[in-house]
Amino acid sequence: MCGPSYCTLLLIAASCYILVCSHAKSLQGTSKLDLGNHISAGSARGSLSPASPALSEARQKRAMGDYKELTDIIDELEENSLAQKASATMQVAAMPPQGQEFDLDTMPPLTYYLLLQKLRQLQSNGEPAYRVRTPRLGRSIDSWRLLDAEGATGMAGGEEAIGGQFMQRMVKKSVPFKPRLGKRAQVCGGD
């Protein structure tokens, strides 16, 4: 009785493996940036719930926008790379290629997002992306970054008028640590 169900399970697993391998090989035959067709084909296959066509349409538009932006950035980088290679070949006759190709079809979404962020950062002349830093509980927040040189000199007269208390408060702001105690902690503490 266990034999036919095991064989059936094995047959299903083998057919799924063959299906996945054939789909992966069909994707390998495409060009390196055929992601736009892959995105539209993925959305054409349909989602599991028919109640979210607006959500899938918005997701597809966002993905296509990111795709177009990525292709523009890659084209710019390729043009810059070709110009650099042309100038380098004039100086040095033989130089090994240092480019690295990325397979966007098999790239995980997080890696794709990080690559897109890095390309945006490189395109914006190496300026680091803005990151919001939140202080840890119980630590102090330095507010000196909020004050620039002009603002600090403008406030110097006001500081003397108040007696130095304003700048004292601006220099260090403490965040007290208050642990949240739920019902379980209150019950355990009451025993």
Swiss-Prot record:
Leucine amide found at: L137, L181
N-terminal signal peptide: 1-24
One Gene Ontology biological process: ecdysis, chitin-based cuticle
Organism superkingdom: Eukaryota
Transmembrane portions of the chain: none
Entry GO MF terms: ecdysis-triggering hormone activity; hormone activity; myostimulatory hormone activity; neuropeptide receptor binding; signaling receptor binding
One annotated Gene Ontology cellular component of this protein: extracellular region
Subcellular location: Secreted
Residue ranges the record assigns to the propeptide: 25-119, 185-191
Keywords, sorted A to Z: Amidation, Cleavage on pair of basic residues, Neuropeptide, Secreted, Signal
UniProt tissue specificity: Expressed in a subgroup of neurosecretory cells in the subesophageal ganglion from embryonic stage 9 to larval stages.
Family (UniProt): Belongs to the pyrokinin family.
Function text: Probably has a role in larval molting.
Name the UniProt record assigns to this protein: Protein hugin
Gene: Hug
